[in-house]
Amino acid sequence: HLSLRRQRQMCIRDRVYGFYDECMQKYGSANVWKSCCQVFDYLNIAAIIDGRVLCVHGGLSPEICSLDQVRTITRVQEVPHEGPFCDLMWSDPEDIDTWSVSPRGAGWLFGNLVTQEFNHLNGLELIARAHQLVQEGFKMMHDDNIVTVWSAPNYCYRCGNVASVFQVGDLLDTPARPEADREAQDDTQGEPKSHSRFGPSNFKIFDAVPDQDRMLPARNPASQYFL
């Protein structure tokens, strides 16, 4: 299991979403919360699965064309308000061709041609990201070159959405398509197309536990270790 950096970890520092209160309730002090805030700055910005799947929280950046450029980003810092680091955390795929200004005020909206070109240049089959609520748990876009995976059912206890887990394992046992075959197909089609072999069968869908079945954990006394 590998945790990746996301943009809302700055909100945790600001004591949003209840993490600070949970630490105070369980451990009796803010020491655990402070330690977690320090750890967040060291989380990886992105991860690559078997050289085929790029995992990132948000999306792409107009300042990044290759995976090597992602590797050069200094990650031990708070997420900046602009630039490639910010874009990787905040950008979203959209039903457009290239780039557009994001209504979020940070990052960009990027289109089908952007995703196809990035995957083609970097030998990727898929970009897996989160960052946007998807009612069905996952959403394939850009000719199946990118997928949004949402793993929080009934988000904020009111959205009524299902969630999903992306299961990659079986496909990693099969060899990737040779680059020559990819280029041959691209030449016949005139532009990069989808090389993804991922589909609905790769996603495990689950729902929130019904309210009547929820079991609250017993409230244990605060551990002396963290006092």
For each of these PLM feature ranges, what is it?
Residues 1-8, 12:
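Single conserved hydrophobic/aromatic residue that forms the stacking wall/gate
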Residues 7, 40, 57, 131, ...:
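Divalent metal-coordination and catalytic microenvironments
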Residues 13-31, 53-125, 136, 151-157, ...:
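Active-site-proximal loop/helix segment associated with metal-binding centers of metalloenzymes
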Residues 33-36, 41-47:
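Conserved N-terminal structural segment that caps and organizes enzyme catalytic cores in eukaryotes
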Residues 40, 146-151:
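Conserved active-site segment immediately N-terminal to the catalytic lysine
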Residues 48, 55, 148, 165-169:
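Short, well-ordered beta-strand micro-motif
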Residues 133-137, 145:
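Short amphipathic alpha-helical segments embedded in low-complexity Lys/Glu-rich regions
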Residues 174-176, 180, 184, 188:
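Short linear motifs in low-complexity or flexible loops
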